[in-house]
Amino acid sequence: MLKVWIVGSEGQIGEAINEVLDPLEIEVLNTDKNALDITETDEVLHFGEINRPDVIINCTGITDTDECEKNPEHAYRVNALGARNLSIVARKLRGKDRPAFHR
């Protein structure tokens, strides 16, 4: 069975993807900011190694420009380092031939 990891599953895009995948025979792993801190490389690697997803869909991000300007370091950590950490997991677990999606 295909295993899909939706990172940021509680957001608008994550919830929409869950609705699409729900009727399919796919195991969905949902994480949000309360369950997993994507800015922490070791935490992301640990989750990936334990669960070994076939596909990673990154629905995380701080899109509010005012928020990004108020706290640029946090915005950078989530938007850049978080995406980097997920790509490290994808590469480490599956190599270049396995998909990872970033919204």
Please provide the spans of the model-predicted regions:
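N-terminal Rossmann NAD(P)H-binding glycine-rich loop of SDR-like oxidoreductase domains
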Residues: 2-23
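Residues at the starts of beta-strands that form the adenosine-phosphate
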Residues: 3, 27, 96
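SDR active-site strand-loop-helix element
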Residues: 7, 31, 59-60, 97-103
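Adenosine-cofactor binding site in Rossmann-like domains, unifying the SAM/SAH pocket
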Residues: 22-46
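Helix C-cap/helix->beta junction micro-motif
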Residues: 24, 51, 92-94
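NAD(P)H-binding glycine-rich loop region in Rossmannoid oxidoreductase-like domains
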Residues: 41-78, 103
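NAD(P)-cofactor binding segment of oxidoreductase domains
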Residues: 70-98
